[in-house]
Each structure stands twice: as C-alpha cells, then as structure tokens.
C-alpha cells in the first residue's frame, strides 16, 4: 500500500482462514462503539464505495459490551463510520463471543526503513519523554514489564534503544508522528502482525527500527473502551476463526 508521498508495507504471516456466510443482523449505528481511531482517507474511500454500490458489501463484526446495551466493533470500524456519515441508521453485523478461544488478539508493531531521528525529535517536541534504554534485538524478550506499561513504545535499532513515554495515550501521538512523517516521504512505514518476523527483519538489516509496545489482552480492550478510550489506528489485530462472506446489504434496508 502506498501513496505518492508515503509508502506503507503490511507484513502478516500466511493464513488459511476460511470465508463463511453468516446471516447478518441489523444493529443501530449509535449502539456500536469503536475502539480505534479512524483514518480519514480510508473513511472517504469506503463512503465512495458504499455510495457507488448502493450497498454495504460485508457485515462488520461486533460483540456485546458486558453490562451495557452497546456492542464493541471488533472488525469494521471504517465501514461503520462510513455508514453513519452517510446518514443511515443501521448497519449489518455479525455478533461473536469475544472471549471465545477461537478469537485471538494480537498487537500491531510499527517499524521504519529510514532515519528514526526525526520521529524521536518530533515526539519530544510534542511533549513525550525520550530516554535511552539498555535493550537490544537479542534481548527484546527481556524488556521490563513496568517499562513497557509506562512507555508508548520501546524503539529498537541495531545500535539503538529508546523508551518513549506516554503509555497507551502516548501511542496516539507517536502514531500520528509516524503517519505525518511517512506522508512527507521521510521513511517507509512497516506494520508487523508478528514480533518474530519483525525481529528477523531487524536483525537482517532490512528493517532499520522497530517500535515495540505492550501486548494487549481482551480484558484491556474492554476496560479501555468502557472508560471511553479509543486506541490509535493499527493497534489491535483481531484474528477471527472465519472471514465474513460478502452479503451486499442494500442501503434501503439500513434507513
């Protein structure tokens, strides 16, 4: 995925997750809660697609938020936002058991090919602390849990370790910095679905810097959302037992 000014690479392991048809249910958009911030370009793209097809091509995946009458959006934030922005009242959904062992949660890890110095300088300019740390590619598995909790990211290079402060809220600032500088063409932005692959690329020299953060649990996500929190884009990576097959729900059914 790339644009005229910024290049983004998504690296995921190969999977054999099947597509499955599930009859969607229509849920009011105001009863759905997103847990990640939106990317404007993706939202506009989906609004145009939905308008041109006069339908929502596939249902979003949601789960009940315990103790409320609302649902957490597990997958489909931008489709939900597009339908809502277009003025429709409902959206097709598949309801899952979030805490089932069949539903996995992992965390996206950003990395860059290029110079990390502008990122660290801009993060500091926006109020985040940047401190030296003592970890390396070979000792990344030993990063102190308290340091991970308090940091937005631990940045590792072959000869560099920096802890950026801010915790989960700081991740939003760093994510914004990464996206802005990437769009200026300062570096290639890489998103990893698996830490092991990221570390291999870092060791080989293909990747220059990796941004490691605390892994989230499903309980973390539910607690954060119930407290009104919204993560940075590309934070959670949910792995479902199936991909929803396309159903093409007509827009007239969503009024």
Swiss-Prot record:
Family annotation (SMART domains): ParB (SM00470)
Keyword terms, alphabetized: ATP-binding, Kinase, Magnesium, Metal-binding, Nucleotide-binding, Transferase
Pfam families: ParBc (PF02195), SerK_C (PF18231)
Gene3D superfamilies cross-referenced by the UniProt entry: Conserved hypothetical protein from pyrococcus furiosus pfu- 392566-001, domain 2, Conserved hypothetical protein from pyrococcus furiosus pfu- 392566-001, ParB domain
Keyword Transferase found: yes
EC code(s) of this entry: 2.7.1.225
Gene Ontology biological process terms, A to Z: chromosome segregation; positive regulation of sporulation resulting in formation of a cellular spore
Chain residues that bind Mg(2+): 75
Keyword Nucleotidyltransferase in annotation: no
Top-level taxon of the source organism: Archaea
Catalytic activity: L-serine + ATP = O-phospho-L-serine + ADP + H(+)
SUPFAM superfamilies (alphabetical): ParB/Sulfiredoxin (SSF110849)
InterPro entries: Chromosome_partition/occlusion, ParB/Sulfiredoxin_dom, ParB/Sulfiredoxin_sf, SerK/SbnI_C, SerK_C
Residues the entry annotates as binding O-phospho-L-serine: 74, 76-78, 108, 234, 236, 238
MF term (GO), any: metal ion binding
Cofactor: Mg(2+)
Coiled coil region boundaries: none
Active site: 36
CDD domains: ParB_Srx_like_nuclease (cd16400)
A GO CC term assigned to this protein in UniProt: chromosome
Function description: Free serine kinase that uses ATP to phosphorylate L-serine to yield O-phospho-L-serine and ADP.
Protein family membership: Belongs to the SerK family.
Full protein name: ATP-dependent L-serine kinase
Organism of provenance: Desulfurococcus mucosus (strain ATCC 35584 / DSM 2162 / JCM 9187 / O7/1)
Lineage start: Archaea, Thermoproteota, Thermoprotei, Desulfurococcales, Desulfurococcaceae
